[in-house]
From Swiss-Prot:
Primary localization class, coarse: membrane
Protein species of origin: Bacillus cytotoxicus (strain DSM 22905 / CIP 110041 / 391-98 / NVH 391-98)
Transmembrane segments: 358-378
Top-level division of the source organism's lineage: Bacteria
Gene Ontology CC terms, in alphabetical order: plasma membrane
Cell membrane among keywords: yes
Disulfide bonds: none
UniProt KW keywords: Cell membrane, Membrane, Transmembrane, Transmembrane helix
Cross-referenced InterPro entries: DUF445, UCP032178
Chloroplast listed as a keyword: no
Membrane topology value: Single-pass membrane protein
Protein name: UPF0754 membrane protein Bcer98_0694
């Protein structure tokens, strides 16, 4: 009976000692959090291992994350995964489509993105671009004649427009002199003419009787403007002036016309400000509707694909510039010892319990073997 009691006692003591020893060793990893002193003598094994080596732990965790967890190869493999690429493309298409279907005006959207005064900036950019174009043109063709400087299609267009311009001028002239305003202007011109000729008006009045001079002159002026010969005369005049202009040098125009005047004339003539304002007041949906399908179905997948490919090729460089190891090290260094202990225990709680149980099992086994050995010795 005493033999079995001895064996049970040694086994129990061994299990208790083994389990408690491992439990104490685990606790000593974290506790105490600070060194303990008796007088000037520091108690051995204080502070615990992890509090004592926290800075080294932070460095090693940073290296572990970079060398074994977030590696360039691992990230590159993820970026080239077909399922991941498909998900990214679908997500990008949904988000871009939301932007393109926005019913707010482009002006409101840009102002929301803190791009205020976008209209003024757009007009200013256009003016600056035109100024650069004018500068480039004048610098390049300063000693050229306009015939040499202007492209061939401009020559052809002007030649084509001369007959149309002559017809337009004569048509407008005819319409003007047929109107009451034109008749009144013609009357004034006649009155001014005869006023400087003294009695000439009385002599003409004798020949015309009760018919006023303007009533006789107006039909003749209109008839003159409508004659084919007049049209040909005006075409010839315009053609001669065009030929003279082509023979002049570009520098002649640049010497008496400021470039700013040219730019402002172009902006004013083309109503650039009104065009920009009208464009900005349109909804994003209306502006993007003609190209929405092409953007969502073609452009977005291509951009995402190229972006992922670029990411694969530059992952190592990005991680190096990001200095991920330093980020992890700095974050871990800011953890309190209590939080660090809680973090480690939350991850390894079950494993540490098993280590405690294993210590108890080994201690109990050793105690049992001691009991058996004592039995044989007795």
């Amino acid at each position: 009976m005493n033999v079995w009691l001895n064996m049970l006692t040694t086994t129990g003591l061994g299990a208790i000692i083994g389990g408690y020893t491992n439990h104490l060793a685990i606790k000593m990893l974290f506790r105490p959090h600070r060194p303990i002193y008796i007088g000037k003598f520091r108690v051995p094994f204080t502070p615990g291992l992890i509090p004592k080596r926290r800075d080294e732990l932070a460095v090693q965790l940073g290296k572990m994350v970079v060398d074994h967890l977030l590696t360039a190869e691992g990230i590159g493999k993820k970026l080239t995964d077909e399922n991941f690429q498909r998900e990214m493309i679908q997500w990008a298409q949904i988000e871009v489509d939301k932007l393109l279907m926005n019913e707010r005006s482009l002006r409101d959207v840009l102002e929301k993105w803190e791009l205020a005064h976008v209209e003024e900036k757009a007009v200013q950019e256009i003016e600056e671009m035109l100024m650069k174009k004018v500068d480039t043109f004048v610098s390049k063709y300063y000693t050229y004649t306009w015939e040499q400087a202007l492209p061939q299609f401009v020559h052809e267009k002007v030649e084509e427009m001369i007959p149309k311009a002559a017809t337009f001028i004569l048509t407008r002239g005819t319409q003007f002199f047929e109107s009451d305003e034109g008749k009144a202007r013609l009357q004034k011109m006649i009155d001014d003419f005869f006023a400087s000729r003294g009695t000439l008006l009385n002599i003409v009045g004798m020949f015309l009787g009760n018919v006023s001079v303007v009533d006789r002159v107006q039909p003749e002026v209109i008839k003159f403007l409508q004659q084919e010969g007049t049209k040909q005369l005006l075409r010839d005049v315009l053609q001669k002036e065009w030929q003279k202009f082509k023979g002049r040098e570009v520098k002649e125009l640049a010497s008496f016309i400021e470039k700013e005047m040219i730019v402002k004339y172009i902006v004013s003539t083309t109503k650039t400000r009104d065009i920009v304002s009208g464009f900005l007041n349109q909804s994003v949906q209306k502006i993007c509707e003609p190209v929405r399908t092409n953007i969502v179905e073609t452009l977005v997948p291509n951009i995402v694909q190229k972006g992922l490919t670029w990411g694969v090729n530059n992952t190592a460089h990005i991680l190096k510039r990001f200095r991920l190891a330093e980020v992890v090290q700095q974050e871990v260094s800011t953890f309190s010892t209590e939080r660090l202990e809680e973090l480690v225990l939350s991850i390894t709680k079950n494993e540490l319990k098993m280590i405690t149980y294993l210590g108890a099992l080994l201690g109990g086994t050793i105690g049992l073997m001691q009991g058996i050995l004592l039995l044989f010795l007795m």
